[in-house]
């Protein structure tokens, strides 16, 4: 089996010539014809690194041969050594592969990478890799499992001894007719012990009894091949860096895979199909035999496996072959139950082609070690065809029964669960032969399932009873027995996803292919003697399929046909030997499988696409909805911005309008204030002018009334105390008389002016007196009382003093005090009756003060205009009239100036001049 696996990954054209004569003869082969196993063996002989893919190995070997001085194109290879090295290399790589599979995707070994690359090349045309083994725990029950290096000869010997013991025990149970073959197989096992490190025993076994044994082993290999590829392919799918199937540890894997196949596990079936096609396409049957031999030691250490591992030795191979035939039968039944699920035709064709080519090589190409052993096996099989078929059936039934109940599925695993976890968990209730964690390679993210094989059905039942519905790594796991009946149905129960169908179909396909392989091998062995391969093949095409297996097993050598076919995956010629029954059955099953396979693949593809489409449509709807919402949001924001802008503009316009109105109001208020101010100022001016005019009129009137007395007379009267009674009567009469009388000055005699001396009046003092009076008039509230009092007293006393002096000097009678004071008070009252604004009066006062300096005589009690007001003795100065005050001219033009001068002494400030 290991050889089969190695052939799957590694054998090229050299696969056809893999079987050489059993003798350890040396033959020259081209470097390009060497398989990876051979390349590695040659490299190990030369102590050169044997890791890497085929191209790297070829380059390394070529360089090593050139260094030795040899011809790299013609390499001498000892057939025995070749076979041994191939086996050993496969065995040596098995631990590596085990390590890779144990760790799942966690580890990548260099050898695994090369082997995976080669195996992937072989599998590139096969699309039936539905099941991928995520993780596989190789059971360390046997020493073979413990072998991590190629040189663990001790472990191999132990395993071989175990296998020998097993074979002996089985021999006792086998029919006597098989005893001969068993003995021969025993000898073969002894040979295996002697050369345990190399596993080249198959080539050394040349007894005729080997033929039937080889045939049976090939049949078993068909099964194991299929089951092992399950592992292998899964590892390839899951771990691109895993080693090639050829490098897969054949011993342990084969044991596990066989068990898995016995349980007709759908997942294995899937994997089996994929790897099986490649294995058969590229490996010879001798490889298969070798693999079986290797594998049996592996399985035997696994206690419970021994029944399944009967083919361990070539003798066990006899029993195993019968078991394989039975397995093929079971697989055919399974196939019938799950007809919809069929393996890809390519896989089977390649497998059949591989068989044909191998057997042709066995019969026709003696130089290859594989071929020689195969031909020998064919001869042996011819010797006892019917016995072989019977023994096959028996062993297969026993094996099926024994392995049927030992396998169980573990579903609901956590994504972190590894095969070693399962092994540790179930080892509490018995010996765990194999444990795998598999998933559906077609649907990423599919759930993981565990497939566990116990050593006995009782232990499996115990595990199911104790561990069903228990918790592992935080997940509830369910443990269910793996049934042989409908493989596809079991997987469907296990999985709701497409992976179920694919797995079951793969298992069916693998079963059918294995059965076909068995029948083909048997028939080939029988036909090897007859040599009528082609005819039987034609007949086989015409035969129906249901009873083909039994018919094929019975008609041992009668209906085989050898056909050389080009392997599709590698383009290598492969010899396929088929019996008529096996071929037709294979063709029918292949058609059925291919149809179901296509159907399933289509369905699975549609199913895979449906959720994707729904997700895409949902995401598209969500995206459209979000875009629509974004557009609506953007539109709403835009409208909102426009509304806000309009509102802002309206507010700004209203603010501007209010500002304009406010400014207009302020302007109107200013104008009103200005007009009011002008009006008040005009009123004040009019008041002042009227007051001045009145004062002047009073002065004139008084001077008119005053008798034109000579100065001596005045001087005489000076002692009369100002004629109080007479003066008072006159003043009373005057002040109470009508002031509006326009002719009151007409009787004034201008000639009297000459009597009064002209007093030169200081302009500044006159204006100062005017200022003083005006200040008194303009601030009645603040100092009206004191000012009036001062003015009254000044006027009175000034008049008194001046009159007194005048009377003293000139005889003028002093004017009475009272009338001037009273008149000043009355005039003050009259002048400021309408005044309201003190500040404005102050300003106006100042303005009048500066601007009316030309009328210096307006505000004093007796001051007349000093500047330009009088022209000589002419009429009243135009300064007064120019301001719009009507002043009578008639009668005044004589002594007006003198009159004013005469009255000026009434001011106290001028008394010092006299």
Swiss-Prot record:
Low complexity composition bias: residue spans: 1-24, 319-330
Compositionally biased region (Polar residues): 275-286, 371-383
Crosslinked residue numbers (Glycyl lysine isopeptide (Lys-Gly) (interchain with G-Cter in SUMO)): 231, 294
Signal sequence coordinates: none
Gene Ontology MF terms: chromatin binding; RNA binding; RNA polymerase II cis-regulatory region sequence-specific DNA binding
PTM note: Sumoylated by PIAS1 with SUMO1 and SUMO2/3, desumoylated by SENP1. Sumoylation is required for transcriptional repressor activity.
Region ranges (Interaction with SAFB2): 599-914
GO cellular component, one term: nucleus
Compositional bias per record (Basic and acidic residues), positions renumbered to this chain: 225-234, 293-309, 346-359, 390-401, 477-551, 559-570, 581-636, 748-795, 816-831, 840-850, 904-914
Cross-link (Glycyl lysine isopeptide (Lys-Gly) (interchain with G-Cter in SUMO2)), chain numbering: 172, 186, 381, 392, 483, 514, 543, 570, 578, 846
Composition skew (Acidic residues), residue ranges: 67-77, 98-117
In-chain residues carrying the UniProt-annotated modification N-acetylalanine: 2
Numbered residues of crosslink Glycyl lysine isopeptide (Lys-Gly) (interchain with G-Cter in SUMO1): 578
Subunit structure: Monomer and homodimer. Interacts with KHDRBS3. Interacts with CLK2. Interacts with POLR2A, ASF/SRSF1, SRp30c/SRFS9 and TRA2B/SFRS10. Interacts with SRPK1 and inhibits its activity. Interacts with RBMX. Interacts with FUS. Interacts with ZBED4.
Name the record gives this protein: Scaffold attachment factor B1
Organism in which the protein naturally occurs: Pongo abelii (Sumatran orangutan)
Gene name as annotated: SAFB
């Amino acid at each position: 089996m290991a050889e089969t696996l190695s052939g799957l990954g590694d054998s090229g054209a050299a696969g056809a010539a893999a079987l050489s004569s059993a003798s350890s003869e040396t033959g020259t082969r081209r470097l390009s014809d060497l398989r990876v196993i051979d390349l590695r063996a040659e490299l190990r002989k030369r102590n050169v690194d044997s890791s890497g893919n085929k191209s790297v190995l070829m380059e390394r070997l070529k360089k090593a041969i050139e260094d030795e001085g040899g011809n790299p194109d013609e390499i001498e290879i000892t057939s025995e050594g070749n076979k041994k090295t191939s086996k050993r290399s496969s065995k040596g790589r098995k631990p590596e592969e085990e390590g890779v599979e144990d760790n799942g995707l966690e580890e990548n070994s260099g050898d695994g990478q090369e082997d995976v690359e080669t195996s992937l090349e072989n599998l590139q045309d096969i699309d039936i890799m539905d099941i991928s083994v995520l993780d596989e725990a190789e059971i360390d029950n046997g020493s073979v499992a413990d072998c991590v290096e190629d040189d663990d000869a001790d472990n191999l010997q132990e395993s071989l001894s175990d296998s020998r013991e097993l074979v002996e025990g089985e021999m006792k149970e086998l029919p006597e007719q098989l005893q001969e073959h068993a003995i021969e197989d025993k000898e073969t096992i002894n040979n295996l012990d002697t050369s345990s490190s190399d596993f080249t025993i198959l080539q050394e076994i040349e007894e005729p009894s080997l033929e039937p044994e080889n045939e049976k082993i090939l049949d078993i290999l068909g099964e194991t091949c299929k089951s092992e590829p399950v592992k292998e392919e899964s590892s390839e799918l899951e771990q691109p860096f895993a080693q090639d199937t050829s490098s897969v540890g054949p011993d342990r894997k084969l044991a596990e895979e066989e068990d898995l196949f016995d349980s007709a596990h759908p997942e294995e079936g899937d994997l089996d199909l994929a790897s099986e096609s490649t294995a058969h396409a590229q490996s010879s049957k001798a490889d298969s035999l070798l693999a079986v031999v290797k594998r049996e030691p592996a399985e035997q250490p696994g206690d419970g496996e021994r029944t399944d591992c009967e083919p361990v030795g070539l003798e066990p191979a006899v029993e195993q072959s019968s078991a394989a035939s039975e397995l093929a039968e079971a697989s055919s039944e399974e196939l019938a139950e799950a007809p919809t699920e069929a393996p890809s035709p390519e896989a089977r064709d390649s497998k059949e082609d591989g068989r044909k080519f191998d057997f042709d090589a066995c019969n026709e190409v003696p130089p290859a070690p594989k071929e020689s052993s195969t031909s020998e096996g064919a001869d042996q099989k011819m010797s006892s065809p019917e016995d072989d078929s019977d023994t096959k059936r028996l062993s297969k039934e026993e094996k099926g029964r024994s392995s049927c109940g030992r396998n169980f599925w573990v579903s609901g695993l956590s994504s972190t669960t590894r095969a070693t976890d399962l092994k540790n968990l179930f080892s509490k209730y018995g010996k765990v032969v194999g444990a795998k964690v598999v998933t559906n390679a077609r649907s990423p993210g599919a759930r993981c399932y565990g497939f566990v094989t116990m050593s006995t059905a009782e232990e499996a039942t115990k595990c199911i009873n104790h561990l069903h519905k228990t918790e592992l790594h935080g997940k509830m796991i369910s443990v269910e027995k793996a049934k042989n009946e409908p493989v596809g149905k079991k997987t469907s129960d296990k999985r709701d996803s497409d992976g179920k169908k694919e797995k079951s179909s793969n298992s069916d396909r693998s079963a059918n292919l294995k059965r076909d392989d068995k029948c083909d091998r048997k028939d080939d062995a029988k036909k090897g003697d007859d040599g009528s391969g082609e005819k039987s093949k034609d007949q086989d095409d015409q035969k129906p399929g249901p009873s083909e297996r039994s018919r094929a097993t019975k008609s041992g050598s009668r209906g085989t046909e050898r056909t050389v076919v080009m392997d599709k995956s590698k383009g290598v010629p492969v010899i396929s030997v088929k019996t008529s029954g096996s071929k037709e059955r294979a063709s029918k099953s292949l058609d059925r499988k291919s149809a179901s396979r296509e159907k399933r693949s289509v369905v699975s593809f549609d199913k895979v696409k449906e959720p994707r489409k729904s997700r895409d449509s949902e995401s598209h709807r969500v995206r459209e909805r979000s875009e629509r919402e974004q557009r609506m949001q953007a539109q709403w924001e835009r409208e909102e911005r426009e509304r806000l802008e309009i509102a802002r503009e309206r507010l700004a316009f209203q603010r501007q309008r209010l500002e304009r109105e406010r400014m207009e109001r302020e302007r109107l208020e200013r104008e009103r204030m200005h007009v009011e101010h002008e009006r008040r100022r005009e009123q004040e001016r009019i008041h002042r002018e009227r007051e001045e005019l009145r004062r002047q009129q009073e002065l004139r009137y008084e001077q008119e009334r005053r008798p034109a007395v000579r100065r001596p007379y005045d001087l005489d009267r000076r002692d009369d105390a100002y004629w109080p009674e007479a003066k008072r009567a006159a003043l009373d009469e005057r002040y109470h008389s009508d002031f509006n009388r326009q002719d009151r000055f007409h009787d004034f005699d201008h000639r009297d002016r000459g009597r009064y001396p002209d007093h030169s009046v200081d302009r500044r003092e006159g204006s100062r007196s005017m200022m003083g009076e005006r200040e008194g008039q303009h601030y009645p509230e603040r100092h009206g009382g004191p000012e009036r009092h001062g003015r009254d007293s000044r006027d009175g006393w000034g008049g008194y003093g001046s009159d007194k002096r005048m009377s003293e000097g000139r005889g003028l009678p002093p004017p009475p005090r009272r009338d001037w004071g009273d008149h000043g008070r009355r005039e003050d009252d009259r002048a400021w009756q309408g005044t309201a604004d003190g500040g404005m009066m102050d300003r106006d006062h100042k303005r009048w003060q500066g601007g009316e300096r030309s009328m210096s005589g307006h505000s004093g009690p007796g001051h007349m205009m000093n500047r330009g007001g009088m022209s000589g003795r002419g009429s009243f100065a135009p300064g007064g009239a120019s301001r719009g005050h009507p002043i009578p001219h008639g009668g005044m033009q004589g002594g007006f100036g003198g009159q004013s001068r005469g009255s000026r002494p009434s001011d106290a400030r001028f008394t010092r001049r006299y």
